Amino acid sequence: MKEKIKLSGVPETMLQTIYARAKESGGRGTIHDTKAEEIVGKLDYDFTLAEKDTAMHSGVIARTIVLDRLTKAWLSAHPGAVVVNIACGLDTRCYRMKGFCHWYNLDLPETMAVREKLLPESGTISQIAMSAMDDWGGEIKEQNAPVLVVIEGLTMYLSEADVQRIFAVIAKRFCQATVFVETMNPMVVKRFKEKSIDANNAKFTWGVKNGEALAELLTDFRFVEEHSLCEGMAVFAPVYKVLDKLSIVRNISNKLIVLEKV
């Protein structure tokens, strides 16, 4: 019997993103996410809008390609690390990665209740049912391991104060940490809508120009580098290899920003 899921607002967007990954994995195959395929097959949910929303699909897949590459490389250089995946939704990256000692998936209680049904996790993969703005640091048991925090698909639904609060929680808990955080350009926040996301009453509310501008808002973190989602788009749409060289395209593309705690 299929699982009927009832969510609304930002939490419901996780159903759109996992559908995009499942569809790509079972179709064109630029990513391989068998867990996503399994989960979508278990759900009683109308994915009609997600099926038609090509912009959302392309963005999710591009982001997955780039973040998988960055995470794999970081874990290779930091064996035995702790990973905290903030706003995890139904993300399945923990099943595609190796080399970590403990992976924590964190999201709102209503979201984690759904995840627990579909992806019951234990051992080296744990679930934390808390807001990203709550003081969740005490849930992380390891003391001296390298730390990677991933914040994917979240900041564009928050306020500047919310984003600063999340980084304050990270800074309070960890002496050293690397953060991969996805951001949206402010111009895109004001003008762009994804059909399937908008239908869930989830609205884009905040953006930042680039990684250097983000670091200026944070007292305990320094900017390391940033990656445009065009890098991921180029994998399945080669024209983006050219477009990515144009500053106007890079500027409006979502960024994956790398920061380190100082």
Regions found by a protein language model. Give the residues of each.
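Conserved beta-strand signature within the Rossmann-like core of class I S-adenosyl-L-methionine
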Residues: R173-P186
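A conserved beta-strand element that flanks and buttresses the S-adenosyl-L-methionine
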Residues: V149-V150
